[in-house]
Amino acid sequence: TTELLPVGTEAPDFQITNDKTGEKIFRLSDWKTKTDADGKVVPGVWTVLDFWASWCPDCRKDMPKVKEISKKYLTKIQLVGISFDTDKEKMNKYLSSNHYDQWMQYCEGKKWKETQISKDYHISWIPTSYLIDPEGKVYFSTVKAEEMMQKLDSLNNLGKLTAFIEMPHYPGGKAVLMKQLSVNTKFPKLCQKYKAAAKVKVEFIVEKDGNVSDVGIQSYQVLDNPNGKDFNKLSGAEQTQVRSQIRTLFEQEGIRVVNTLGKWIPGKIRGEATRVHYTVPIVFRLY
């Protein structure tokens, strides 16, 4: 790592934009310590930059640890993947199929050595990761995700990593949320008839004003397959059709019940209300 940017170097700035709209999604320099219009100091945020590519075997080997970093320090650091993939579609497919799409990605769509960011950050090997401090300077660099985790753990133990994200929460807390879900959820009759059970993860956005939008299904897990005399009488094709109907009904009910919850207390980033992605698990089981 001797060729990498030295500790204390101002981290070269870069920006992630929406490919379709050109809208800014992220700019590194926006996350430095700053003073707002009222003269109040807004603390900066620690940022991990992970340089990688989906075609790189060592990068793929390190990805589970990068995901662990993302999960463990979700509210305390920004994690940005910087990919040297030339095919963004392939990159996105790799990320989504392996559930590595929970953090931001920067990709110029050019060959590694032709990218500006590889020159700015002196990247001669991947994977490589940098830790940028709240003042926007290089604090640490490594070619091993495990070492980055150890550095973050050390900083966290010293109390230097503090939450900059406040997650949305339901008025009255989790117990009230669970009660609302339990009271308002209706068990579909077809699912009851065939004694089916499932766990549905419903995802949605809690908007800045606390309203819920973009409600959809993140995952569906069968807990009990349909069974009983009525189900066993069906042909193979009919059983397949029933399973599909059961899934549709459970998913529709999950979406419906989340839409009945009303307003949430919105999440905040650095003290300002913001849109936050959220998931709620709903278990459908009668017995």
What is the predicted role of each segment?
Residues D50-K71:
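Conserved redox-active cysteine motifs that mediate thiol-disulfide chemistry
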Residues Y100-D101, G109-D153:
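Thiol/disulfide oxidoreductase modules built on the thioredoxin-like
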Residues I69-K113, K119-I126:
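Conserved segment of the thioredoxin-like fold in thiol-based oxidoreductases
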Residues G44-T47, F51-W55, W125:
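Short pre-active-site segment immediately N-terminal to redox-active cysteine/selenocysteine motifs
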Residues E10, V45, S124-I126, K195-V200:
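Short, small/polar residue-rich loop motifs at catalytic or cofactor-binding pockets
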Residues D153-Y287:
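Charge-biased low-complexity segments
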Residues Q15-T47:
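A short beta-strand-turn-helix
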Residues T1-D13, T17:
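N-terminal targeting signals for export/organelle localization
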